[in-house]
């Protein structure tokens, strides 16, 4: 196999691969023999079909199979031989069965341009102070009370107010036609939550059971449902019932209602404080990492190809749609993949890629690698996530994308810990945090 590289730019290389004639001949002959045994052509016994006949029927198919097989088998080897590390999937083109009998193809490989990175020791960071105030615990308790509130139908005929739950039927109309997919019966609208539309709930305040009201609201162009995106929607709403929320008392019975493992209110409060503390610690780590990354990005200039950034934008849009789908929402892909939205995503997409490249560079320069124990932990985490046994993950998915991504994430965490240990630290006060 002959391999050569042509420099197109610092971030793009043309990889040229040629398979020798003898190897090509062997592969094609094998395909013809296999095809001869498999096919049935009238007038010929199985295995006795002349090659010229097979070629007239299946010649192009055989060439395509051989071409795909050679690319699949030789491309990773060619990358290794030339030490090219593609940032995204390469574009393979110019495949040829040459007159000499050889087979050749070309691949455009997008790579990270060479860059130097120094001065990452001694970065200045300010660590947020970590503390959980009583007010935070009280706020979480109030949220739990809201979750466990009892809904009672109003005994008096007072009008609905914010915080009440209105049981309603509603029918939306778009351009004079009923939007059937948007209709709902016995919908429980908590007034003030603005779950249907930011302007929807205000039209329920002051209404009584039995009343019907009509009003219009405007949906933005990027509304999740394409039928109403950028449209003015007329809602006809019938209030069937108004319920008020009755919050439970803060006592030991409430704690047990939240979770039977709590035998007293103080135990619930302590658990809430511990969970809030974990949240504060996570946020503090994220804040420090953000400070580190901002300084690292200011130290280098890396020109990425447009294709690399585009693929990261694709990934970000895909993740967003996946989040919606996981919540049971079927979204119109075109609404989230417009040129305007993609342009908005590009700065963050570029930042994501640079983050990975810079951290990878530091890990390489500082020889930061995963220990055997940390690799074992990766297998265990993937096995838990995929609901497989660890042995299966090790033997069948050791080189899978999910395992590699998990390893990469752990190395990045190791790099951040190293940089933090080498940094010059100050502290952010609670007053500064609250500003």
From Swiss-Prot:
Residues 163-248 form the PPIase FKBP-type domain. Keywords: Cell cycle, Cell division, Chaperone, Cytoplasm, Isomerase, Rotamase. InterPro entries: PPIase_dom_sf, PPIase_FKBP_dom, Trig_fac, Trigger_fac_C, Trigger_fac_C_sf, Trigger_fac_ribosome-bd_bac, Trigger_fac_ribosome-bd_sf, Trigger_fact/SurA_dom_sf. GO terms for cellular component: cytoplasm. GO terms for biological process: 'de novo' cotranslational protein folding; cell division; chaperone-mediated protein folding; protein transport; protein unfolding. It is an enzyme of class 5 (isomerase). GO terms for molecular function: peptidyl-prolyl cis-trans isomerase activity; protein folding chaperone; ribosome binding. Its main location: cytoplasm. Its EC number is 5.2.1.8. It is found in: Cytoplasm. The keyword Chaperone applies. It catalyses: [protein]-peptidylproline (omega=180) = [protein]-peptidylproline (omega=0). It holds the Pfam family FKBP_C. NCBIfam families: tig (TIGR00115). Consists of 3 domains; the N-terminus binds the ribosome, the middle domain has PPIase activity, while the C-terminus has intrinsic chaperone activity on its own. Involved in protein export. Acts as a chaperone by maintaining the newly synthesized protein in an open conformation. Functions as a peptidyl-prolyl cis-trans isomerase. Belongs to the FKBP-type PPIase family. Tig subfamily. This is Trigger factor.
